[in-house]
C-alpha cells in the first residue's frame, strides 16, 4: 500500500490538510480508495475514488502559485531535469504515483518539445493489486515467455497488471 505522505508532500499546505482530512478520517472513503486528485487553476480540487465517486473541495480554489508549488515539488526544483517526462505529459514519483500535467505545448519544427503555463495537474494514485495477474501468468510464461500486448482504456489497470506479472516472474 502506498503511503499518503508520498502524495501529500507534493501539495501546498492548505490543500494537503484537506486531502489528509478527507481520506484519513474513519468512515470516509479512505486513502486505499483514492484514485486521483484533480487540480486545475481557478477551480476547486476534486478527489476521485475507485467507486467513481468524487468529492469537490469547494472551499479551496487552486491558484497558479499552487500549481507552481506542486511542479517544484514533483521536479525537486529542477524542472529542466524532468523536461522529457513533462513533454510526454506526466512524471512518475516515489511510490509509482503519476502526476499528469497539461498546459500550453511548446513546439519546434512541428514536434512538442515542452510545456509552459501548466494549468492542470492530475495525480493518479498507484494501487497494488496482488494476484490480479494470477489467471494469465501461466499463459504468458508457459513454454517460455510470449510476446504480450496489454491494451485497455486509461485507468483500467494496465500498469497494475504489469506490476503483478513482474512480481510473479
Predicted regions and their residues:
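The conserved Walker
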Residues: 154
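Conserved glycine(s) of the Walker
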Residues: 157-158
Amino acid at each position: 500500500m502506498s503511503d499518503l505522505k508520498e502524495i501529500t508532500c507534493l501539495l501546498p499546505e492548505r490543500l494537503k490538510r484537506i486531502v489528509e482530512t478527507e481520506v484519513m478520517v474513519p468512515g470516509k472513503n479512505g486513502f486505499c480508495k483514492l484514485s486521483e486528485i484533480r487540480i486545475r487553476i481557478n477551480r476547486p480540487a476534486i478527489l476521485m475514488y475507485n467507486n467513481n465517486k468524487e468529492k469537490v473541495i469547494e472551499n479551496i480554489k487552486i491558484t497558479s502559485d499552487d500549481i507552481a508549488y506542486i511542479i517544484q515539488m514533483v521536479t525537486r526544483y529542477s524542472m529542466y531535469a524532468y523536461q522529457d517526462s513533462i513533454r510526454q505529459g506526466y512524471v512518475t514519483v516515489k511510490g509509482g504515483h503519476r502526476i499528469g500535467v497539461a498546459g500550453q505545448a511548446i513546439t519546434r519544427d512541428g514536434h512538442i518539445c515542452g510545456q509552459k503555463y501548466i494549468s492542470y495537474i492530475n495525480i493518479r494514485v498507484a494501487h497494488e493489486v496482488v494476484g490480479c495477474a494470477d489467471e494469465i501468468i501461466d499463459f504468458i510464461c508457459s513454454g517460455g515467455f510470449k510476446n504480450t500486448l496489454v491494451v485497455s482504456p486509461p485507468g483500467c489497470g494496465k500498469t497494475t497488471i504489469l506490476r503483478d506479472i513482474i512480481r510473479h516472474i
